Amino acid sequence: MSPQTETKASVGFKAGVKEYKLAYYTPEYETKDTDILAAFRVTPQPGVPPEEAGAAVAAESSTGTWTTVWTDGLTSLDRYKGRCYHIEPVPGETDQYICYVAYPLDLFEEGSVTNMFTSIVGNAFGFKALRALRLEDLRISPAYIKTFQGPPHGIQVERDKLNKYGRPLLGCTIKPKLGLSAKNYGRACYECLRGGLDFTKDDENVNSQPFMRWRDRFLFCAEAIYKSQAETGEIKGHYLNATAGTCEEMMKRAVFARELGVPIIMHDYLTGGFTANTSLAHYCRDNGLLLHIHRAMHAVIDRQKNHGIHFRVLAKALRMSGGDHIHSGTVVGKLEGERDITLGFVDLLRDDFIEKDRSRGIYFTQDWVSLPGVIPVASGGIHVWHMPALTEIFGDDSVLQFGGGTLGHPWGNAPGAVANRVALEACVKARNEGRDLAQEGNEIIHEACKWSPELAAACEVWREIVFNFAAVDVLDK
């Protein structure tokens, strides 16, 4: 070894293991407008200080590793490393902390949700020094957002395509979700659309199974759309699920849907993956298709309060990757969804600028810099008695989707659709007249029953159906 090499080694590199907090905990750091900011709920192992735990998350999700390496000297760690810049205890918890981490923009590939998540949540969640770790929120910088196309069309363009204004849209998931032949499936779609719904929907696991291959389903559903449009004079749609085992097969199904002239297709974005979803969103914009997104598998990731990724992060990621609709919970139905939290990420989906509001679980102010909005879809265990609450909670820019609440009507599918449409129109009319849907909802529905026997029958069937279970994911008090 030459003297020159010996001098460089002794000055620039010292082997060994250092505490993460020496390099990655920087409370004096002032965040930049271009930084991507993350709020992690950290539960350290006993004996691990929160500063070390937060710094470990910052290190393992950016430039750090478990030991000092000589190649650190070949780059500028100060330019590229993540920094834990603030830590606060979680109210009511003795061993949990919110650790805020800032990531330089250059760590991420432009226009790639896949790369963003691979960095931020790809490795740190298995770190032994942590008992649990949850990504609560992200602040996506405007500079990074501008590298994404986002939703294929957005809320206003969708309304213009459908020529439907001033009310929520109505949908129905066809049940049973598995087992119907393509012809019977198409028949159910036609009956629901003819009865007054705007959309019918493939369930998330309807792809191309032996009992109903995708091409047959697409053809019969397209027939249902055109027949119901001719009879009602309204534009109709069916969410044709293009999700497949390969991206090539997915795109083939999307192309066939476009050739049929249908207005909307569907993708399961978490099981299908962000790369596939972004590719499909680009195709949909280029070819005039709306894109409905199902969040199948989300509860595996977001249900636990102290570990995983909160759905508000998955919702932001979807807006970046691309989708015109996404399921968002109902607040009042059978699926998890606390009101303030749900409305927090509903605003993150729809609005252009959202202020920080910890009372709704929003950790950062988010500016979407004109990225199109996404329509939230309320679906899961809802029926006509829920209509006033759903209209009041979600407002006009939403899809209210009744599966069993349409197809379970005692008189059949079309009367079930009629009941839902009448209930919705009654609620919108009452709201526009200044009535309080939260206080007068049942009275409004009862009044509408007098001139709609279909609604009266639905109200009788579901008058005692409730889902009274405590939410798991609640705000910290």
UniProtKB/Swiss-Prot annotation:
Regions crossing the membrane: none
EC number: 4.1.1.39
Residues where Mg(2+) binds: 201, 203-204
Residues recorded as bearing N6-carboxylysine in the entry: 201
Cofactor binding annotation: Binds 1 Mg(2+) ion per subunit.
PTM characteristics: The disulfide bond which can form in the large chain dimeric partners within the hexadecamer appears to be associated with oxidative stress and protein turnover.
UniProt keyword Acetylation present: yes
Cofactor: Mg(2+)
Additional comment: The basic functional RuBisCO is composed of a large chain homodimer in a 'head-to-tail' conformation. In form I RuBisCO this homodimer is arranged in a barrel-like tetramer with the small subunits forming a tetrameric 'cap' on each end of the 'barrel'.
Descriptive protein name: Ribulose bisphosphate carboxylase large chain
UniProt organism field: Lathraea clandestina
Organism ancestry: Eukaryota, Viridiplantae, Streptophyta, Embryophyta, Tracheophyta
